[in-house]
């Protein structure tokens, strides 16, 4: 693919995926406003969030397939208008059904673009600057998640939320305009012999996503005492096991489970999942604590939320500078230890803590999470033979998003149930519930450190960037081979990626 400049591709990547990430976290922050405006209950107001997450996870594996068939430019120019339509539906919605439809369109468009843009982004950087891709992945993608939280806080403060989705739609419209001029057609596989579509895998994935969504809806409505909830989760578990078995055995799977069954991809998946859940739990508890317990003003809460961007910037810069020097394992250890410290401080926070203390904890939370996400993301991507990189990473992203799909609902459900079990005043009950959330986040942080130590024990793995003359100093280049039938010793022997091999590997799905 021809590009004008790698920073243009970076901009296109952020405009393709960022608005969807912003929309998800912003909508979670303005649930109270949505309930007042649309006239819905707490139960139904979270359904659009769940449906959007479901569509996001479900459509991730479709991105590489659509790119292979049609090319990146047509898919880009088709997906972003779908996202714009979804944003307009939400912004103009008068009932929860339209909001759910809008979130489905947003999630589907973002899911399709995720695994199209990540390989394109990494491929666009020259070999000696490839570590800059982490600057965009963490600063742009993870930063979009944080910006969504900040915008949601601002919307809550001013009492209006619809303008958020006009902004998200406008960002996607800018992406369409930029892609029209700078994203060119590429060679794709339409003329080649097409491999048979994995219909069984696609159907099982759809059924799995639907069963998961229904189960979480039942949980929100009836709680764990209902038999329907347990039946739903039982069906979901059976479908998940069936999907893993089918995708492991099929020749051309929709989700390449077999290719990610290596130490680094598995550990990377667990690290990303634990890291994203940790920050979701911590932010939810801390913002609720500040609003309800400390009676902090909305202006101060917005300023505190803005400090999260400082942590994102720190994480992006450190990830880009340190990944090739220390490897994903050590990067994850550093981030995990920061999160352990932050959650330990929140467990023992004093009633008279200053705003400066809160700001420092916010910065450290964002920085620690960013480092762990970088470690898990790149550790999983680079943790196996290169020809299977995109397929392996697609499987990791699908499973990560599937695990995260119901987290917002679980956080809300746990907080309300935990507070209801407590005796005493409402304020004391909520304080105990938030304290329990901090404890859960602390346990997850400790788990992150342990997983990162395991990642570090597997070795540094591939480097992202190196000088062109470095490849002459390395061992003779091995032929690009698939992970199937590859010994562990051979997999670990890859250290520096030859530029030609790297680019051919990332283009593997387009041929």
UniProtKB/Swiss-Prot annotation:
GO process terms (BP): transmembrane transport
Disulphide bonds in the chain: none
Region annotation Disordered: where it falls in the sequence: 465-486
Major subcellular site: membrane
Pfam families the UniProt entry points to: MFS_1
Membrane-related topology note: Multi-pass membrane protein
Subcellular locations according to the entry: Cell membrane
Molecular function terms, GO-annotated: transmembrane transporter activity
Keywords, sorted A to Z: Cell membrane, Membrane, Transmembrane, Transmembrane helix, Transport
Key word Transmembrane helix present: yes
TM helices/strands, residue ranges: 7-27, 46-66, 80-100, 107-127, 134-154, 163-183, 200-220, 226-246, 266-286, 301-321, 329-349, 357-377, 394-414, 437-457
Cellular-component GO terms for this entry: plasma membrane
Xref: PROSITE patterns: MFS (PS50850)
Keyword Metal-binding in annotation: no
Matching InterPro entries: MFS (IPR011701), MFS_dom (IPR020846), MFS_trans_sf (IPR036259)
Family: Belongs to the major facilitator superfamily.
Organism: Bacillus subtilis (strain 168)
Protein name, per record: Uncharacterized MFS-type transporter YubD
């Amino acid at each position: 693919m021809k590009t004008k400049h790698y920073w243009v591709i970076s901009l296109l990547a952020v405009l393709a995926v960022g608005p969807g990430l912003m929309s998800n976290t912003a909508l979670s922050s303005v649930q109270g406003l949505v309930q007042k405006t649309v006239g819905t209950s707490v139960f139904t107001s979270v359904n659009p969030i769940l449906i959007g997450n479901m569509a996001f996870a479900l459509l991730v594996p479709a991105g590489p397939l659509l790119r292979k068939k049609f090319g990146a430019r047509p898919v880009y120019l088709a997906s972003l208008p779908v996202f714009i339509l979804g944003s307009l539906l939400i912004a103009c919605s008068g009932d929860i059904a339209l909001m759910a439809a809008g979130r489905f369109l947003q999630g589907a468009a973002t899911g399709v673009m995720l695994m199209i843009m990540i390989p394109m982004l990494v491929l666009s950087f020259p070999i000696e600057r490839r570590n800059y891709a982490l600057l965009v992945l963490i600063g742009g993608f993870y930063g979009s998640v944080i910006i969504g939280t900040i915008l949601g806080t601002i919307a809550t403060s001013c009492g209006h939320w619809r303008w958020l989705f006009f902004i998200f739609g406008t960002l996607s419209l800018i992406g369409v305009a930029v892609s029209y001029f700078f994203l060119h057609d590429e060679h794709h596989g339409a003329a080649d012999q097409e491999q048979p579509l994995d219909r069984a895998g696609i159907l099982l994935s759809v059924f799995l996503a639907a069963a998961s969504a229904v189960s979480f809806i039942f949980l929100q409505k009836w709680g764990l005492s209902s038999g329907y909830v347990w039946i739903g989760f039982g069906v979901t578990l059976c479908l998940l096991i069936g999907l893993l078995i089918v995708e492991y055995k099929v020749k051309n799977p929709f989700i390449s489970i077999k290719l990610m069954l290596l130490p680094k991809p598995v550990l990377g998946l667990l690290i990303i999942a634990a890291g994203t859940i940790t920050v979701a739990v911590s932010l939810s508890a801390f913002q609720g604590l500040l609003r309800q317990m400390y009676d902090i003003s909305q202006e101060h809460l917005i300023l505190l939320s803005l400090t999260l961007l400082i942590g994102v910037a720190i994480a992006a810069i450190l990830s880009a500078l340190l990944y090739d020097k220390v490897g994903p394992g050590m990067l994850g250890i550093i981030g995990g230890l920061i999160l352990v410290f932050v959650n330990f401080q929140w467990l023992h926070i004093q009633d008279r803590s200053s705003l400066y203390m809160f700001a420092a904890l916010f910065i450290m939370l964002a920085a620690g999470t960013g480092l762990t996400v970088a470690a898990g993301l790149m550790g999983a991507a680079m943790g196996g033979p290169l020809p299977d990189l995109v397929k392996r990473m697609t499987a990791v992203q699908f499973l990560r998003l599937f695990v995260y799909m119901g987290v917002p609902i679980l956080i809300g459900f746990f907080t309300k149930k935990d507070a209801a079990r407590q005796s005493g005043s409402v304020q004391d009950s909520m304080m105990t519930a938030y304290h329990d959330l901090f404890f859960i986040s602390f346990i997850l942080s400790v788990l992150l450190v342990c997983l990162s130590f395991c990642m570090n024990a597997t070795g540094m793995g591939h480097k992202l960037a190196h000088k062109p003359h470095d490849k002459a100093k390395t061992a003779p280049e091995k032929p690009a081979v698939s992970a199937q039938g590859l010994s562990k010793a051979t997999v670990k022997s890859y250290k520096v990626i030859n530029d030609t091999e790297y680019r051919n590997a990332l283009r593997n799905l387009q041929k």
